[in-house]
Curated annotation (Swiss-Prot):
The gene is rlmH. It is found in: Cytoplasm. InterPro entries: Alpha/beta_knot_MTases (IPR029028), RlmH-like (IPR003742), tRNA_m1G_MTases_N (IPR029026). This is Ribosomal RNA large subunit methyltransferase H. Homodimer. S-adenosyl-L-methionine binds at residues 76, 108, 127-132. It comes from Rhizobium rhizogenes (strain K84 / ATCC BAA-868) (Agrobacterium radiobacter). GO terms for cellular component: cytoplasm. It is an enzyme of class 2 (transferase). SUPFAM superfamilies: alpha/beta knot (SSF75217).
Length: 160
């Protein structure tokens, strides 16, 4: 299953980008052995619209263009369901085992995600109830993708 990340906003060169890239590289190397591969990282500029609702709508259009037809859509949202690492790995494994070809994990902009996306989403999850800056969210989800691969493959990286 090909996994893509979609993010509103661009990571500037620096330690955050380096750390996210390190975990995505680990995921890209370990994932194919268990049927998971990194397909793409799509970054789009934040909308310049004058109000939040318009910005969210414009960003949702960009997400829909980047998301493969028939693919699984997971939204990251502070109001989403909190999963531990094992449950996140199980969710990815379930989608993979159902024969799903593409999965996109979406990180919204400062205004959040457009309400229309929630109806289309296959899952809405959170990385805790706190609000995180998008730079840190990318690091956290990149690490959790790598951790999910290690859980699904029985690698000792994940210890409880």
């Amino acid at each position: 299953m090909r996994i893509g990340l979609f993010a509103v906003g661009r990571l500037k060169t620096g330690p955050e980008k380096d750390l996210a890239a390190r975990y995505l590289d680990r995921f890209a190397k370990a994932g194919p052995a268990i049927g998971l591969e990194l397909a793409r990282m799509t970054e789009v500029a934040e909308s310049r619209a004058s109000n939040g609702e318009t910005r969210k709508r414009e960003e949702a259009v960009l997400l829909q263009k980047a998301h493969p037809d028939g693919g699984i859509l997971i939204l990251l949202d502070e109001r989403g369901k909190a999963l531990d690492s094992e449950a996140f790995a199980a969710l990815l494994g379930t989608f993979r085992d159902q024969g799903k070809r593409d999965l996109t994990i979406a990180i919204g902009g400062a205004d959040g995600l457009d309400p229309s996306l929630y109806d289309r989403a296959d899952a809405t999850i959170c990385l805790g109830k706190m609000t995180w800056p998008h730079q840190l969210v990318r690091i956290l989800i990149a690490e959790q993708l790598y951790r999910a691969v290690t859980i699904l493959s029985g690698h000792p990286y994940h210890r409880v």
